């Protein structure tokens, strides 16, 4: 039976179509979810994609975090459903309380758009278990507010518990500890700023490395 992965669309979402394609290329059935609907249609996992939900008013991700669909995502995550937040989706998961830290204006206050290398630091999460230890992946990065910030106590906890999932090889936005992505305590909720869904085809992406995240969650769902 094919796994079903939901992709949420908010007003201002940009990368939902790309996430849907990545899910399909990985071998799962994508299910389009609307922000105003509480019904997650019995999906097996959820992707919260990037963009500028609600125009980033108040704070990036702040309004989207209280949308009906996100209330259901929080409840599903608490039951163990795998959830991936990409870029603005990462911000939304933080605002919803599913992931720690905050994402602020980039160092230098410029929007950055380039292909970057990430170290995969934790290969045991629901979204990274198909990567080998020590793997570097090449994926696009495009954001103006991607600088990971957290208190010293939170940073120590994340590092000590192995919850830093991705780390920038070259820290291009000033993130604390070069953190690009983190996970929940159980490793089933992952958020990262760069865009794996844009690295799934050689024609349009810098590599196929992004497919690994979507293939990993399929492995999680069938295990």
UniProtKB/Swiss-Prot annotation:
Chaperone listed as a keyword: no
Ranges where the Glutamine amidotransferase type-1 domain occurs: 4-223
Reaction catalysed by this enzyme: N(2)-formyl-N(1)-(5-phospho-beta-D-ribosyl)glycinamide + L-glutamine + ATP + H2O = 2-formamido-N(1)-(5-O-phospho-beta-D-ribosyl)acetamidine + L-glutamate + ADP + phosphate + H(+); L-glutamine + H2O = L-glutamate + NH4(+)
Gene Ontology terms: cellular component: cytoplasm
Pfam families: GATase_5
CDD domains for the chain: GATase1_FGAR_AT
Record-linked PROSITE patterns: GATASE_TYPE_1 (PS51273)
Swiss-Prot/TrEMBL keywords: ATP-binding, Cytoplasm, Glutamine amidotransferase, Hydrolase, Ligase, Nucleotide-binding, Purine biosynthesis
Function: Part of the phosphoribosylformylglycinamidine synthase complex involved in the purines biosynthetic pathway. Catalyzes the ATP-dependent conversion of formylglycinamide ribonucleotide (FGAR) and glutamine to yield formylglycinamidine ribonucleotide (FGAM) and glutamate. The FGAM synthase complex is composed of three subunits. PurQ produces an ammonia molecule by converting glutamine to glutamate. PurL transfers the ammonia molecule to FGAR to form FGAM in an ATP-dependent manner.
Subunit description: Part of the FGAM synthase complex composed of 1 PurL, 1 PurQ and 2 PurS subunits.
HAMAP family per record: PurQ (MF_00421)
The protein, known as: Phosphoribosylformylglycinamidine synthase subunit PurQ
Gene of this entry: purQ
């Amino acid at each position: 039976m094919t796994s079903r992965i939901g992709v949420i669309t908010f007003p201002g979402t940009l990368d939902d179509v790309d996430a849907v394609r990545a899910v399909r290329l990985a071998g799962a059935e994508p299910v389009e979810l609307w922000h105003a609907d509480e019904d997650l249609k019995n999906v097996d996992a959820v992707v919260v994609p990037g963009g500028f939900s609600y125009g980033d008013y108040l704070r990036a991700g702040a309004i989207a975090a209280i949308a009906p669909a996100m209330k259901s995502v929080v409840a599903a995550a608490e039951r163990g459903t795998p959830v991936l937040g990409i870029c603005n989706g990462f911000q939304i998961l933080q605002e919803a309380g599913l992931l720690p830290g905050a994402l602020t204006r980039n160092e230098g206050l410029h929007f950055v758009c380039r292909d970057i290398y990430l170290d995969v630091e934790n290969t045991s999460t629901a979204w990274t278990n198909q990567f080998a230890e020590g793997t570097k992946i090449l994926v696009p990065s495009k954001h103006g507010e991607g600088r990971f910030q957290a208190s010293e106590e939170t940073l120590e906890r994340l590092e000590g518990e192995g919850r830093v999932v991705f780390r920038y090889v070259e820290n291009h936005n000033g993130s604390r500890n070069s953190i690009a992505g983190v996970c929940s305590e159980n490793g089933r909720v992952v958020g990262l700023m760069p865009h794996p869904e844009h690295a799934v085809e050689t024609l349009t992406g810098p590599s196929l490395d992004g497919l690994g995240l979507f293939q990993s969650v399929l492995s999680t769902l069938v295990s």
